[in-house]
C-alpha cells in the first residue's frame, strides 16, 4: 500500500512538472524592468500568461512621486504579451485606496487560472481583492517582497513593531512566497515561514538587450558630451535624488577624494537636487558635477558604458536593478551594505567595493582607489559583466515556474 501511494505521488509530481500552467500576473502598472520579463514568460512553453494592470502609469505619461517629474518610458512596455487594464476606482495616489480595482474579481473568477502572481503591495486595496478572488476561485496565490530587513524607509520605529506582528500572518497568505535576493529569503525565513514555502526568483533585467545596447554605444562620444576626456574619471550616480539614496554622501566623498580631472554625474531627478547643487557650489566643485535630470531607458546603456564606476550609497535599498544594468554594460559598481543587490551581485566578485552605509570617509577611500588604480577598476567591471549572468531572465523564469508548481501542489494537498 505504501509503495502504491509513493508511486501515485511520484507520477503526480511528474505530471505536475510537465503541466502547462494558466497564470495571471497582477501588476500595479507597467514597469520597464518587468515588460521584457513578461515577454519572455509569454514565450515559455509551460506558461499561458496574462497580465492585469491596475494602472497604466509609465506606459502613459504621469507624475512619478519619487522622480518628482512626469515619466513615460521610451521602451515598449505593452508589447509581446497578453494584458488587460482593469479600471481603477481609486484616486491613483499612494494611499491604500489609490489602487482599487474591483474588476479583478470577475477576471480571476472567469479566467479559471491555475495561479496568480501578485506584484501589487499589500498596502493597496487591489492586493486584497486579488487575494480574496484567488482563494474563492481555487487559484494558487504567489507574492513576495524585495525588502531584506524590517527597517522602513522613513526609519519610524512603530513600523518595525507592526511588521514583526503582521508580516508572519501576511506571508502565510501566500501559497508560495517569491523573493528576489538571498537577504530577502533569510528575512522571510526569520518570520517563521519555512524554506519550502519560499522560492528565490532573482531580480534581473533583459541582460541581452543591455549588453547589445552597450556594445553599440560610442563611449568616447558620450564622454565628450559629458565634458570628459579619455583620461578623466567619470563617477556615476543613477537613481532618484531622494534622501534615502544618499546622493549627498557621494557628493561629499567626491569633494574630499576627487582629483581635479574627475567628474561626478547625477542621472536622475528628485527633491534633493537643489541641495546638491548648493553643496557643489559651496565646495567650489560645481564645474565638475553634472546634473542630467531624468534619463530615459534607451539612453542609459550609453551612459553606463561611458562611466568608469557607478556608485549607489543608499541607506535603504531593497535591491537596486541599476546594479544589474551597470554590470551588463561592463561598468563596475560601488554600493553600500544596505543595497539589496550587494550580497548577491557585488560581494561574490568585488567584495571590496561594498562600504558601510552612511560612512562618507569609507566611500571617499573607495573613490581614491578608483582614481589611482584604473586597471583594477576595469578588471572589476569585467568580473561583474560575467557574474551578472547568474541573474538572467532564463533563471528567473525557471524559478518562477518552479514556484508556481510548488504553490499548486500545496493547494492540491490542502484539498
Report the location of each language-model feature.
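Conserved donor-binding/catalytic core segment of Leloir-type glycosyltransferases
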Residues: 229-254
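A short, well-ordered alpha-helix in the C-terminal region of glycosyltransferases
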Residues: 362, 369, 376-390
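Short hydrophobic beta-strand element within catalytic cores of glycosyltransferases
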Residues: 332-336
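Conserved acidic donor-binding segment of nucleotide-sugar-dependent glycosyltransferases
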Residues: 347-360, 369-374
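Donor nucleotide-sugar binding/catalytic pocket of nucleotide-sugar-dependent glycosyltransferases
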Residues: 160, 164-219
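Short alpha-helical donor nucleotide-sugar binding micro-motif in glycosyltransferases
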Residues: 294-295, 302-307, 400
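Nucleotide-sugar donor phosphate/pyrophosphate-binding loop at the beta->alpha transition
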Residues: 125, 140-142, 149-173
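Aromatic "clamp/platform" in nucleotide-sugar-dependent glycosyltransferases that forms part
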Residues: 315
Amino acid at each position: 500500500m505504501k509503495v502504491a501511494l509513493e508511486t501515485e505521488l511520484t507520477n503526480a509530481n511528474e505530471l505536475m512538472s510537465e503541466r502547462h500552467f494558466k497564470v495571471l500576473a497582477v501588476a500595479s502598472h507597467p514597469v520597464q524592468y518587468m515588460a521584457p520579463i513578461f515577454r519572455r514568460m509569454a514565450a515559455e512553453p509551460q506558461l499561458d500568461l496574462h497580465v492585469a494592470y491596475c494602472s497604466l502609469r509609465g506606459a502613459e505619461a504621469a507624475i512619478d512621486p519619487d522622480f518628482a517629474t512626469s515619466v513615460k518610458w521610451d521602451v515598449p512596455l505593452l508589447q509581446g504579451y497578453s494584458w488587460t487594464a482593469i479600471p481603477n476606482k481609486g484616486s491613483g495616489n499612494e494611499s491604500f485606496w489609490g489602487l482599487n480595482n474591483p474588476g479583478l474579481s470577475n477576471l480571476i473568477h472567469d479566467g479559471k487560472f491555475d495561479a496568480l502572481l501578485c506584484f501589487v503591495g499589500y498596502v493597496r486595496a487591489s492586493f486584497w481583492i486579488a487575494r480574496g478572488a484567488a482563494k474563492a476561485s481555487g487559484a494558487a496565490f504567489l507574492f513576495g517582497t524585495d525588502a531584506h530587513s524590517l527597517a522602513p524607509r522613513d526609519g519610524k520605529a512603530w513600523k518595525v513593531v507592526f511588521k514583526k506582528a503582521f508580516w508572519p500572518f501576511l506571508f502565510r497568505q501566500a501559497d508560495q512566497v517569491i523573493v528576489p535576493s538571498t537577504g530577502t529569503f533569510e528575512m522571510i525565513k526569520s518570520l517563521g515561514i519555512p524554506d519550502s514555502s519560499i522560492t528565490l526568483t532573482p531580480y534581473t533585467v533583459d541582460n541581452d538587450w543591455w549588453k547589445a545596447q552597450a556594445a553599440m554605444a560610442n563611449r568616447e562620444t558620450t564622454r565628450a558630451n559629458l565634458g570628459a576626456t579619455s583620461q578623466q574619471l567619470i563617477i556615476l550616480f543613477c537613481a532618484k535624488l531622494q534622501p534615502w539614496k544618499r546622493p549627498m554622501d557621494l557628493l561629499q566623498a567626491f569633494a574630499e577624494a576627487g582629483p581635479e580631472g574627475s567628474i561626478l554625474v547625477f542621472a536622475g531627478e528628485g527633491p534633493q537636487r537643489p541641495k546638491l547643487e548648493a553643496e557643489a557650489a559651496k565646495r567650489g566643485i560645481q564645474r565638475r558635477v553634472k546634473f542630467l535630470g531624468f534619463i530615459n531607458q534607451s539612453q542609459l546603456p550609453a551612459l553606463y558604458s561611458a562611466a568608469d564606476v557607478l556608485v549607489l550609497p543608499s541607506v535603504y535599498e531593497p535591491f537596486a536593478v541599476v546594479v544589474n544594468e551597470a554590470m551588463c554594460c561592463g561598468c563596475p559598481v560601488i554600493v553600500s551594505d544596505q543595497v539589496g543587490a550587494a550580497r548577491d551581485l557585488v560581494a561574490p566578485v568585488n567584495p571590496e567595493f561594498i562600504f558601510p552605509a552612511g560612512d562618507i570617509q569609507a566611500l571617499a577611500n573607495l573613490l581614491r582607489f578608483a582614481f589611482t588604480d584604473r586597471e583594477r577598476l576595469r578588471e572589476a567591471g569585467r568580473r561583474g559583466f560575467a557574474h551578472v549572468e547568474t541573474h538572467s531572465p532564463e533563471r528567473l523564469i525557471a524559478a518562477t515556474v518552479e514556484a508556481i508548481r510548488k504553490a499548486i501542489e500545496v493547494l492540491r494537498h490542502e484539498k
